[in-house]
Each structure stands twice: as C-alpha cells, then as structure tokens.
Amino acid sequence: MDPSSAGAGGNSLASASCGDAQKRRVCYFYDPEVGNYYYGQGHPMKPHRVRMTHALLAHYGLLAPAKMQVLRPLPARDRDLCRFHSDDYVAFLRAVTPETQFDQIRSLRRFNVGEDCPVFDGLYAYCQTYAGASVGAAVKLNHGTHDIAINWSGGLHHAKKSEASGFCYVNDIVLAILELLKLHERVLYIDIDIHHGDGVEEAFYTTNRVMTVSFHKFGDYFPGTGDIRDIGYSEGKYYCLNVPLDDGIDDDSYQSIFKPIISKVMEMYRPGAVVLQCGADSLSGDRLGCFNLSGKGHAECVKFMRSFNVPLLLLGGGGYTIRNVARCWCYETGVALGEELREKLPYNEYYEYFGPEYSLYVAASNMENRNTNKQLEEIKCNILDNLSKLQHAPSVQFEERIPETKLPEPDEDQDDPDERHDPDSDMLLDDHKPMGHSARSLIHNIGVKREITETETKDQHGKRLTTEHKVPEPMADDLGSSKQVPTADANSMAINAPGNAKNEPGSSL
C-alpha cells in the first residue's frame, strides 16, 4: 500500500472484482505458550482454545509459507502498554502474583481484579503476549507488506485505562488502533462479539479518527452499555454506533442489519484500515451467549469485510464453547486466505473435542429469534440516520489531538525497539464475556440467574450511559494530531517452519 494514499481509505464499496477466491497477503501471529495460561478451575475463559485453533490450521495445511506468513510475536513492554493504560495499573499487573495478591486487597479492588479477572501464574506475560501480537499485526499492515493480519489470541475489548473487566486485562485492540493511527487518518473498529465493545468505545468516544461499531446483545446483560443512543461526544459525535440486538438472532437477521450498516459506514467514513473483533460467543450454543449464528453466518462478516480490499486486522475475543471457537476461527482464517476448507475435520490432537459430528461447520439451533423484522428495520433506520449526519470523510478536519503513538525510545541494553513492533510478531489476546444476566460480572451468572438491584444497574459498569454522561477519560492527554509512519523493520520470528514452533501441537505438521 502506498503511504501517500493511506488517508483515502481504500475502496469505500465492496468490489465485485475482489472475488472471495482472490488471494490476499495474510500474516498470522501465534505464540506457542499462549495456550498454557490458565484462568483457574471453573473459569469459562480458556486460552487453550487458541492452541486448538492453531492445531486445526496446521492440519488443514494453512500454516504453510505458501499460504500465509506465521509469526511469533514479541512481548509488549511496559512502555508499549502505557500508550493507553495508566502507569500504576501496568505496574500492578506486572507485580501481582497469586501468592502476593491478598496483601494488595485495596489494589485488587481499585483495578477490578478478582473474580471475573483473576490473578493467575504468568498473568503479565500473558498480557504482554497477546498485546504484542495485536500491535505487531498492526505494524505489519502499516508497512503494506500484508493485506490481512490475524491474532486470534487478541480482541480483549472490555479492558479500560486503569481497570480490568470481563476477563480482559490489557486492551490490545486500543493499542493496535493507536499503531494504525500512525499511518491512517481514519480507522474503523467493528465488534461482532455478543458483548458490547465498551472498552474500545470508551477509549475513542471523543474523536472522529476512530469510528466504533458494535453489534451486541443489549439489556440486562454484561457490560450493560451499548445503547443505540450512545453515539459519541464532542468531535466524536456520530462516530460511535451501537446496534442492540435480542436473543436468538440468526444468520439471515444478522446479515440483514450488518451489511447495510457496514456498507454505509464504509461509504461515508472511508477508513484507511479496519479492525474486526471476531468474538465467537455470538455463535449458537455458546456457554455464555444467547445468539444463534452458525459458523458460516459469523464468517460472513469476515468475508464481507475482506471484499472491501482495505487493510484488515482480525482479532479474537469472546467464545466459551471452545470446540466451536476453534472451528469458527479456523474457518475464518480460510475465508481470509480465500481457501475453501473441507467440512470433514482432519484428524488432530484435539479430535475428540469435536465429536460426534467432527465437522468444521458450527450449526445453528432451532432457538426462538426474538428480533422481529420490524425491530431490526427500526434499528437500521436509526443508525443510517446518524450516519447521514456525518461530514463526508474526505473533507473531515482532524483537529483534535490523537493518541500519541510514537515508537518507544530504545533502551541501551535492549534490542532495537522497532523490532518490538514488527508486524512479524504474533501473539494474540482473547478475552471478555458476560455470563448470565448481570451487567456487573460474568462469573456470577454461570448457571445462576442473579437478581440485579437498582444500585447495580446504576453504577459505573451497569448503567445505560447517554451522551450526557459518557465523557470517558480521553486517550487523551497523549493525543497529537501529527501522523507518523512507522519505520520498524520486519524482525519478528517467523514460525512457518514446523521446527520453529517449540513442539506446539500441530506445528510439526
């Protein structure tokens, strides 16, 4: 991609000339250690699902160098995480351990670390891994060497500047978007997780350089935000779109609202790059979800965004029925590559997880769809009306300060910092999910219908925030209007070759 055209946003409309079979240059970030992290017994968040996804990719032959570049990410450093997160929060994550946590009760409460977001062995390394992968993927796109970058371990959209939330500790999405803003005047963020992408929305609520669009379950459901009336604030007014949905939405209903809205967004906003959070808890049968999307229906969103031929970052997110998550992200990797994968799963290390059907496809169920055509049409018209109030993208003046995203200064005893941001790195973070019906906690609602009190629904996490209340801490103080094209060299470790993956399941195939 020619940097001189970065602000133009590429194609604004899906192109018939960019057929699904047309090849894209794809890079995929993966750290063999990511599947070893463990949130604890009974916790629904399982990083192991990323390892299962990787095994499927290996046995389908998608890790071959001829298919895509496979990269091992470099870990994000403190200074990298502090481009968005507060210094004291990052210092806490770095220092806390399962053994010392009970000596830091006040800090645990202050940073919302505990039940949903527990302290576990290797917590900080886990955050460094998935955040480093997402930032590295963004750098790869900025360099123009790849059209699509993938990090299935990322997509942790609930984390705030100084607070963990919904299984998320570090917001790798915000960090990746800040990296993309070095080159692109406008970045579009789309979230198809069943939970509202509150952390990303809050970070960019007052700027027009990032548009956020979230399709999510709304109501008495974690995190309790994402009202259609929340549209952004100040310079960011109308650059935040929320699409509230009800239980049981199926493929046809979902696409009837996703495609018209996103088509109009692409036409009006003309982003230079797109970040698509592919949370798999919107699939039918998810442990914590209540939607009824099939694997193909979920992947249709990826296919549609691919058709615009704009630099695309694919991230993971929620997903708690792990056999479905692995199949979904494997299938969507095939979509990114323009590869048709056979339905019958190849034999692999986790084959028994996928019985009795042993099919790549996640099927929808016969659950009731509570989204009527009338309701969906009203939502669509409301969103399109808000889009009509936007200035046309080419004439937008970006005068507010944008988050500072300069490459970190080198340490005398460290490797070249440019290498730390190389798109060749590959680690992803993936987390967040509401459970049950509480707008405050995901964990409390697994198998338990918990009554929500009036107080709970009106606190920081549970209330329906309107534009009058929702003026988040702007990413703000570090915002600057100048763009900087990253100069990092591609020095992350490529791990296409089977022997380089540290005996990771599937990597030797």
Swiss-Prot record:
Polar residues bias: start-end ranges: 481-494
Alphabetical UniProt keywords: Chromatin regulator, Hydrolase, Metal-binding, Nucleus, Repressor, Transcription, Transcription regulation, Zinc
GO term, biological process aspect, one: epigenetic regulation of gene expression
EC supergroup of this enzyme: hydrolase
Active-site residues, as the UniProt record annotates them: H158
Induction: Induced by drought and salt stresses.
Histone deacetylase, as annotated region: 24-338
Binding site for Zn(2+): D193, H195, D281
Reaction(s) catalysed by this chain's protein: N(6)-acetyl-L-lysyl-[histone] + H2O = L-lysyl-[histone] + acetate
Site (Polarizes the scissile carbonyl of the substrate) location in chain: Y320
Domain of life (superkingdom): Eukaryota
GO cellular component: nucleus
Cofactors named for this entry: Zn(2+)
Record's compositionally biased regions (Basic and acidic residues): 398-409, 418-434, 448-472
Distribution of this protein across tissues and organs: Expressed in roots.
Pfam families linked to this entry: Hist_deacetyl
Subcellular location field: Nucleus
Functional description taken from the UniProt entry: Responsible for the deacetylation of lysine residues on the N-terminal part of the core histones (H2A, H2B, H3 and H4). Histone deacetylation gives a tag for epigenetic repression and plays an important role in transcriptional regulation, cell cycle progression and developmental events. Histone deacetylases act via the formation of large multiprotein complexes.
Family membership: Belongs to the histone deacetylase family. HD Type 1 subfamily.
PANTHER family, alphabetized: HISTONE DEACETYLASE 2, HISTONE DEACETYLASE HDAC1-RELATED
Protein name as annotated: Histone deacetylase 2
Taxonomic source organism: Oryza sativa subsp. japonica
Lineage, uppermost ranks: Eukaryota, Viridiplantae, Streptophyta, Embryophyta, Tracheophyta
